Design a protein with these regions (language model features):
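N-terminal amphipathic alpha-helix/helix-capping segment at the start of soluble metabolic enzymes
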Residues: 2-27
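Glycine-rich, positively charged N-terminal anion/phosphate-binding segment
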Residues: 12-13, 34-79
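Glycine-rich tight-turn/loop motif centered on a GG-T
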Residues: 24-25, 54-63, 104-119
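Hydrophobic faces of well-ordered beta-strands that scaffold small-molecule active sites
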Residues: 26-30, 51-54, 83-88, 107-109
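Active-site-adjacent beta->alpha loops and helix N-cap segments on the catalytic face
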Residues: 38, 61-69, 91-95, 112-121
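Glycine-enriched alpha-helix->loop->beta-strand junction motifs that scaffold or abut catalytic
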Residues: 47-49, 101-106
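Long, hydrophobic/aromatic-enriched structural stretches that serve as scaffold segments
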Residues: 87-92, 102
């Protein structure tokens, strides 16, 4: 059942600032299906802990972007905890942009497939 005034997704910047000020760590967990999301969120609820749910490029292909976003939206309703949705190791600008446009609050680009000069230009 949905709770009133559900907390929206938060950014990792906001989350890390609060963690730094509060002297605690935030767990980041890769997810790709409902059971994994439920297990992680249930544990976070017990601890009343914020969390980062991460999605890899492979998970986006496996489970589809829209399904993963909806799972995380359900986690917000179920937990009312601070949750960030993070793209882990996006391999292109386009994938990162697609994730931001599609509801992710954090992305990390991994351009290690490019040579050093391309990465530092």
């Amino acid at each position: 059942m949905a709770k009133e005034d559900n907390m929206p997704l938060v950014t990792t910047t906001e989350m890390f600032k609060k963690a730094y000020e509060g002297g605690y760590a935030v767990g980041a967990f890769n997810v790709n299906n409902m059971e994994i999301v439920q297990g992680i969120v249930d544990a976070a609820k017990e601890e009343q802990s914020p969390l980062i749910l991460q999605v890899s490029a492979g998970a986006r292909k496996y489970a589809k972007h829209i399904y993963l976003v909806k799972l995380v939206e359900a986690a917000l309703e179920d937990s009312n905890l601070p949750i960030a949705l993070h793209l882990d190791h996006g391999d292109s600008f386009e994938i990162c942009k697609d994730c931001v446009d599609g509801g992710f609050t954090s992305v990390m680009i991994d351009a290690s497939h490019h040579d050093f000069d391309e990465n530092v230009r």
